């Protein structure tokens, strides 16, 4: 079933002399209905197969404030065999989770007795106690219990938080998607979700990142950098370890409160350049003709086969790109490292390659060291330093969510990556099916279409644009543009409700 409606059956068996002990194998079935966050209705029947007896139980509970305040009023009643309703045994009571994992309860019984009790959770362990009283208020039987196993909500980490740095050791290429099997790479969404989780965790006071073996384009690094900047603005620390870093890598690392660099590493602030190889002379020498069909001034994709040098239009647009990239990197680096803009340009134009000693002297980094010595280095920089490895942090089970009738809608994240093609790259034939399926799925509240495409086949681009146009208004479509959304890659975006791009796109 679901959080709204569920059915269940069970079979119980006993051993020994069942007749002597008046015991029986049992068969039971039950149903639970929670149509909204305010009401819960349950019913259960148990049959004693050896005696032809049965018990019927019904219960109802109301949360007057929904899931926001876990106060519940409840009542139940049971009948044996064919008893009339006026013979039913019943009870009614209240349960209140005062704070997370601390629950108080009281119940009144049709026998005119009542009980009070409390339940205290320590996470994987819990203790509970209930005391019965008769109609005169005289105490009767009491019951105590200990719970072991499943993780429950608890207030104790909040009362005595153990602040730790989260260690993120990100190796290899950062991708959008990874293979189902035998792929240990990391995706962009995984990294962003990890940073977001750590940002709201009161037990995490910082992140320390191994950036020595990461491969990603400048746009992906910019997005992760923005998440780390938000993490910092929440009052938490960021430490990044580097060994060799170019201008993109240093731009990323500069967001950190502390940059730790390998003693034998280097930083190269080489700036940016875009260039092309031109093949017209080679083709002429080989007596091969090439005709460029150029419809617009800036459509320069194949001009390197038809010209001997860059056209003025292509030079103009490429210069705009590198100027923007450099301005963004310079602005972010100088703000983060509290550096004068002219001093940064001097570092780029005069030397550009810096050893660890020189980088420390120029305050490009804060200290030197290697990731293998991470804990020792961090202990020197932060008093009472403690850490938790990403594997243990993200593999931790979460407490059971006891929300009623809670089936959150989902956001579909769909990727259009590579050249615009019918059967390769964005794979338009299949992508159309994915988009239409998400449009028709009632559980999907919105669609995020991530585009990273230089363009290509106009037919493939129009396939995707058309399905978005036909479904316009059905549900929100947000296009997120990655490193490139050019030509047909931009065409894909046109009918979205919102288009989001980074300054580097």
Language model regions located:
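Glycine- and other small-residue-rich loops at beta-strand/loop junctions that grip anionic moieties
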Residues: 20, 83, 106-107, 242, ...
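PDZ peptide-recognition modules
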Residues: 345, 349, 356-359, 368
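Small-residue-centered hinge/linker elements
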Residues: 140-340, 345, 353, 379-476, ...
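Outer-membrane beta-barrel porins/channels
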Residues: 1-154
């Amino acid at each position: 079933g679901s959080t709204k409606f569920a059915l269940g059956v069970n079979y119980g068996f006993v051993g020994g002399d069942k007749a002597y002990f008046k015991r029986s194998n049992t068969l039971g079935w039950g149903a639970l209905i929670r149509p909204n966050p305010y009401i819960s209705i349950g019913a259960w029947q148990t049959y004693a197969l050896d005696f032809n007896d049965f018990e019927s139980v019904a219960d109802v509970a109301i949360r007057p404030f929904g899931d926001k305040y876990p106060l519940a009023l409840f009542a139940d009643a049971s009948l044996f065999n064919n008893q009339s309703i006026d013979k039913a045994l019943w009870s009614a009571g209240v349960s209140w989770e005062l704070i997370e994992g601390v629950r108080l309860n009281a119940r009144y019984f049709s026998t005119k007795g009542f009980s009070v009790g409390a339940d205290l959770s320590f996470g994987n362990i819990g203790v509970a106690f209930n005391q019965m009283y008769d109609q005169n208020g005289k105490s009767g039987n009491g019951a105590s219990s200990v719970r072991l196993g499943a993780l429950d909500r608890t207030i104790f980490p909040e009362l005595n938080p153990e602040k730790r740095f989260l260690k993120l050791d990100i190796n290899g290429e950062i991708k959008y998607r990874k293979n189902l099997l035998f792929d240990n790479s990391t995706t962009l969404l995984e990294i962003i979700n990890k940073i977001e989780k750590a940002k709201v965790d009161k037990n995490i006071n910082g992140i320390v990142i191994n950036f020595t073996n990461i491969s990603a384009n400048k746009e992906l690094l910019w997005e992760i950098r923005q998440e780390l900047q938000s993490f910092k603005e929440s009052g938490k620390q960021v430490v990044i370890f580097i060994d060799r870093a170019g201008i993109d890598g240093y731009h990323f690392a500069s967001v950190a409160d502390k940059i730790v660099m390998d003693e034998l590493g280097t930083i190269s602030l080489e700036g940016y350049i875009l260039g092309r190889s031109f093949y017209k002379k080679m083709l002429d020498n080989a007596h091969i003709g090439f005709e460029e069909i150029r419809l617009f001034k800036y459509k320069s994709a194949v001009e390197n086969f038809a010209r001997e040098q860059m056209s003025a239009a292509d030079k103009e647009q490429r210069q705009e790109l590198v100027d923007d990239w450099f301005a963004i990197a310079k602005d972010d680096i100088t703000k983060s490292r509290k550096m004068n803009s002219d001093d940064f340009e001097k570092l780029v134009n005069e030397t550009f390659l810096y050893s660890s000693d020189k980088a420390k002297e120029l305050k490009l980094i804060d200290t030197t060291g290697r990731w293998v010595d991470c804990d020792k280095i961090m202990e020197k920089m932060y008093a009472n330093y403690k850490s938790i490895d990403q594997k243990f942090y993200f593999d931790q089970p979460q407490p059971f969510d006891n929300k009623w009738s809670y089936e959150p809608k989902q956001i579909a994240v769909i990727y259009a990556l590579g050249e615009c093609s019918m059967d390769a790259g964005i794979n338009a034939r299949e992508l159309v099916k994915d988009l239409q399926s998400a449009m028709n799925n009632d559980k999907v509240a919105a669609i995020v279409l991530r585009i990273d495409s230089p363009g290509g086949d106009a037919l493939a681009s129009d396939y995707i644009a058309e399905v978005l146009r036909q479904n316009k208004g059905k549900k929100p479509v947000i296009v997120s543009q990655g490193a490139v959304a050019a030509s047909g890659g931009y065409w894909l975006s046109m009918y979205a409700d919102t288009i989001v791009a980074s300054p580097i796109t």
